[in-house]
Amino acid sequence: MQDSILTTVVKDIDGEVTTLEKFAGNVLLIVNVASKCGLTPQYEQLENIQKAWVDRGFMVLGFPCNQFLEQEPGSDEEIKTYCTTTWGVTFPMFSKIEVNGEGRHPLYQKLIAAAPTAVAPEESGFYARMVSKGRAPLYPDDILWNFEKFLVGRDGKVIQRFSPDMTPEDPIVMESIKLALAK
């Protein structure tokens, strides 16, 4: 049986140690983010869906990560400033973490254990492009790249995992969120 991710200890972007329990009862989209990535414009869509559904109990949670071509090199303060001034991010952001390897954060250990594979867009060539560039994940369940997403239900259990190239406003992601909000 899957454990709730809500008891996991995390550090917010301002350095406060907390758990995700304060988000209990909400549907969450947990995303590993980066500021200098070709997928960084997804911040805009993440903010759009956060604003559209926050009143229904939906929240995006951003976890910066510098493991993919060092595309998140800044300090937490620099990341926060960039996200708020460039993309108008209002959703909760957290301290930079590792999502793969020996230093994988316990949150991502739980997320990946609950959803070892990601749903990708039909005919997506993203994984093949990563492999062709020598950037294949070390293990099949590793996070592939920045902006991989995990949808978590109100009970703290993982519902689905979405590949980095599946945008937040993709119809499959949107429908999954709507179904989770209806529960």
Swiss-Prot record:
UniProt KW Phosphoprotein keyword: no
E.C. no: 1.11.1.24, 1.11.1.9
Mutant phenotype after disruption: Deletion has no significant effect on the binding, transport or utilization of vitamin B12 or other cobalamins.
InterPro entries recorded: BtuE, Glutathione_peroxidase, GPX_AS, GPX_CS, Thioredoxin-like_sf
Example GO molecular function: thioredoxin peroxidase activity
Function: Non-specific peroxidase that can use thioredoxin or glutathione as a reducing agent. In vitro, utilizes preferentially thioredoxin A to decompose hydrogen peroxide as well as cumene-, tert-butyl-, and linoleic acid hydroperoxides, suggesting that it may have one or more organic hydroperoxide as its physiological substrate.
Official protein name in the record: Thioredoxin/glutathione peroxidase BtuE
Gene, per the UniProt record: btuE
